[in-house]
């Protein structure tokens, strides 16, 4: 079984307590790896290293052009290893290989773009109406950026956050979800190969109430960027506010599709099905609500259920699979609880609504594609 340590100052480092926690493969439901459980002391080590790299190390003296070239090299390495990284993500979060591989082929573009932008971050000269005064602005890196990412698209969402930070000259400490840390720990090894100095990119793994809190409240982290749940986002915002830190939050959504009578219903149904069941519905922009004009409601529901019943569930590594398992056991149980809530509140179950027991689902965390009708805004699922 694979064991993953922390990544600090360009090296794999065991946690000071030598404690590790289990990482589960959602398709098998079995433990497949052990992940280091960071403490506040481990977090401090990572932040101190990142701060040193920012203020005194080689990174601090690099030109913007040099940073950009390193980022371009990194993009090439990600493209080279996209298949391997995507395979690890599938083991870790159970999403379809086709989706993960597609994301990994897109990620290099993010580093190419921001690598090209690095030497174009410019200030302005501001005209004044007073003689003897000269006014200008310059843009400077903040320092250490704390990057906290979710379990649904680990590498892609991490890249979205760290690429602009690195282009600006910041250093980063990444805290991935405790459910999907392995791919990030593979990913950051590429920074060393690309030529990034030690300490520029660091990873601490563990739980939010320990490692996450220590990272957000550390006096040397100057910006917090987080993608995840509303509830955790509120906690992070409150913690960061005590220190007046810069905060960027990307939180959950409840996205509606609105379908009117003049729409092409076949196209609308295709879009609605892919919008909710892609990624097993585990995205912040999943189209989890349909607002349908009364005159086409019955026809659209029939088409929607008919198409949804054709979805193939199973091994996320198979090219034939259309719906994979739920990524985490807590999320799996939460979805089932909301199905029960919907039934109890009077929503009409149109299909699904139960654990998937198909042979191809094995012991994984699968739930049948589920659709409710006759839902109103007072119901919790809405």
Put a short name on every predicted segment.
Residues 1-35, 66-69, 73, 121-148, ...:
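Terminal low-complexity tails and localization/encapsulation signals of metabolic enzymes
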Residues 29, 67, 89, 111, ...:
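Residue-level signal for inorganic ion chemistry
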Residues 32-121:
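Glycine-rich loop-to-alpha-helix module at the N-terminal edge of alpha/beta enzyme cores
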Residues 65, 88-96, 126-131, 252, ...:
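Short linear capping/connector segments at secondary-structure termini
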Residues 68, 72-75, 79, 101, ...:
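Short amphipathic alpha-helical segments with heptad-repeat character
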Residues 73-77, 81-84, 186, 190-196, ...:
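Generic non-transmembrane alpha-helical segments
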Residues 123-267:
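Rossmann-like NAD(P) dinucleotide-binding subdomain of oxidoreductase/dehydrogenase enzymes
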Residues 231-376, 380:
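ALDH superfamily catalytic-core signature
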């Amino acid at each position: 079984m694979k064991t993953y340590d922390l990544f600090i100052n360009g090296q794999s480092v065991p946690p000071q307590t030598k404690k590790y926690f289990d990482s589960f493969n959602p398709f098998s439901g079995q433990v497949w790896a052990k992940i280091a459980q960071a403490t506040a002391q481990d977090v401090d080590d990572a932040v101190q290293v990142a701060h040193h790299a920012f203020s005194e190390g080689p990174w601090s003296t690099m030109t913007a052009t040099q940073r950009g070239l390193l980022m371009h090299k990194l993009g090439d390495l990600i493209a080279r290893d996209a298949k391997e990284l995507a395979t690890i993500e599938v083991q870790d979060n159970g999403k379809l290989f086709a989706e993960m591989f597609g994301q990994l082929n897109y990620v290099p573009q993010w580093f190419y773009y921001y690598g090209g932008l690095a030497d174009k971050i410019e200030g302005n000269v501001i005209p004044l109406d007073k003689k003897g005064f000269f006014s200008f602005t310059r843009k400077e890196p903040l320092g250490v950026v704390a990057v906290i990412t979710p379990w649904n698209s680990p590498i892609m969402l991490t890249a979205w956050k760290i690429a602009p930070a690195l282009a600006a000259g910041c250093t980063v400490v990444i805290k991935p979800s405790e459910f999907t840390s392995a791919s990030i720990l593979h990913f950051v090894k590429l920074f060393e190969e690309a030529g990034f100095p030690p300490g520029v990119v660091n990873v601490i793994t563990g739980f939010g109430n320990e490692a996450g809190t220590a990272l957000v409240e550390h006096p040397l982290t100057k910006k917090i960027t987080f993608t995840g749940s509303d509830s955790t986002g509120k906690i992070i915002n409150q913690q960061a506010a005590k220190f007046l830190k810069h905060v960027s939050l990307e939180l959950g959504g409840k996205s509606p599709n609105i379908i009117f009578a003049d729409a092409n219903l076949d196209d609308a149904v295709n879009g609605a099905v892919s919008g909710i069941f892609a990624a097993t519905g585990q995205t912040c922009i999943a189209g989890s609500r349909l607002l349908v004009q009364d005159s086409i409601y019955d026809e659209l529901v029939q088409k929607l259920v008919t198409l949804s019943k054709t979805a193939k569930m199973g091994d996320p590594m198979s090219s034939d699979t259309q719906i994979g398992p739920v990524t985490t056991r807590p999320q799996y149980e939460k979805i089932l609880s909301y199905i029960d809530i919907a039934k109890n509140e009077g929503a009409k179950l149109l299909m699904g609504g139960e654990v998937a027991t198909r042979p191809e689902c094995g012991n994984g965390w699968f739930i049948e594609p589920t659709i409710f009708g006759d839902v109103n805004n007072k119901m919790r699922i809405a």
